[in-house]
Amino acid sequence: MSTLRLLISDSYDPWFNLAVEECIFRQMPATQRVLFLWRNADTVVIGRAQNPWKECNTRRMEEDNVRLARRSSGGGAVFHDLGNTCFTFMAGKPEYDKTISTSIVLNALNALGVSAEASGRNDLVVKTVEGDRKVSGSAYRETKDRGFHHGTLLLNADLSRLANYLNPDKKKLAAKGITSVRSRVTNLTELLPGITHEQVCEAITEAFFAHYGERVEAEIISPNKTPDLPNFAETFARQSSWEWNFGQAPAFSHLLDERFTWGGVELHFDVEKGHITRAQVFTDSLNPAPLEALAGRLQGCLYRADMLQQECEALLVDFPEQEKELRELSAWMAGAVR
């Protein structure tokens, strides 16, 4: 029986693909070496310890239907589109060695005619006339008896969109957590015009087989049926949940301020695990009562635009004469935390 396993996903859903990755990683025999190839439609993928409100322009992502996905490994935020090829290498210990998987990717690039080299802890770079340019970034995860190395290769990604989504709004946000370090990047199509996802996958697969001296048939993961993987439904539900993608953010504070025709408002939020643990409201409004009531209602509320709107609009029952002010406040708050 072969010790290798090759899986290729036809899904572009980041939550689906990360759930597949997690299920395989949890249930694989310690003697197995796995290669999983995949790609995602428009998504910002953040590291396990990152704060999406700090790392991303969450409002623009929502407007453009860009998903947020938190992975189980560390590292920084990256933008995925169909111009990225994603790879995951898994192995039990002591077989797991990220230098082996890195060399497999370098060999694959070399076979395609691209001379690249490892740089720093987790990047692959190519030399250009403008200097070194990153074409691949990776992250890693290890448990007691196994580990994985996953990463992306930039084929023909829309690099302009990185800046759109990976630069957060200039919010007054004091946040803990890992901050991404931006690198200068380039696409492989600059070096190999016309290179495709399928060609890159084939090159990585051949380098994987060559390293281990074995070949196996690829298992195709279809988006049209639930994968036959233990606990997939539960894993997918968690991976796609707001509680995991947003609620796992490290504790942070958020200061919002705005001036309306009826007065200025300053909101101070402390947020832990996606819930507001403390809310303070300051205002020079001539009628501060609804705002004082709002501060009490927001304590314990999910830090989510629709929930903030719901709590604000619930005050219309008690303060019908301030309907205009409350609706303006509700719309502003929702926009500010997206």
UniProtKB/Swiss-Prot annotation:
GO terms for molecular function: ATP binding; lipoate-protein ligase activity; lipoyltransferase activity. One of its GO terms (cellular component) is cytoplasm. One of its GO terms (biological process) is protein lipoylation. InterPro entries: aa-tRNA-synth_II/BPL/LPL, BPL_LPL_catalytic, Lipoate_ligase_A, Lipoate_protein_ligase_C, LipoylTrfase_LipoateP_Ligase. Residues 29-216 form the BPL/LPL catalytic domain. It is found in: Cytoplasm. Pathway: Protein modification; protein lipoylation via exogenous pathway; protein N(6)-(lipoyl)lysine from lipoate: step 1/2; Protein modification; protein lipoylation via exogenous pathway; protein N(6)-(lipoyl)lysine from lipoate: step 2/2. Catalyzes both the ATP-dependent activation of exogenously supplied lipoate to lipoyl-AMP and the transfer of the activated lipoyl onto the lipoyl domains of lipoate-dependent enzymes. Is also able to catalyze very poorly the transfer of lipoyl and octanoyl moiety from their acyl carrier protein. HAMAP family: LplA (MF_01602). This is Lipoate-protein ligase A. It comes from Escherichia coli (strain K12). The gene is lplA.
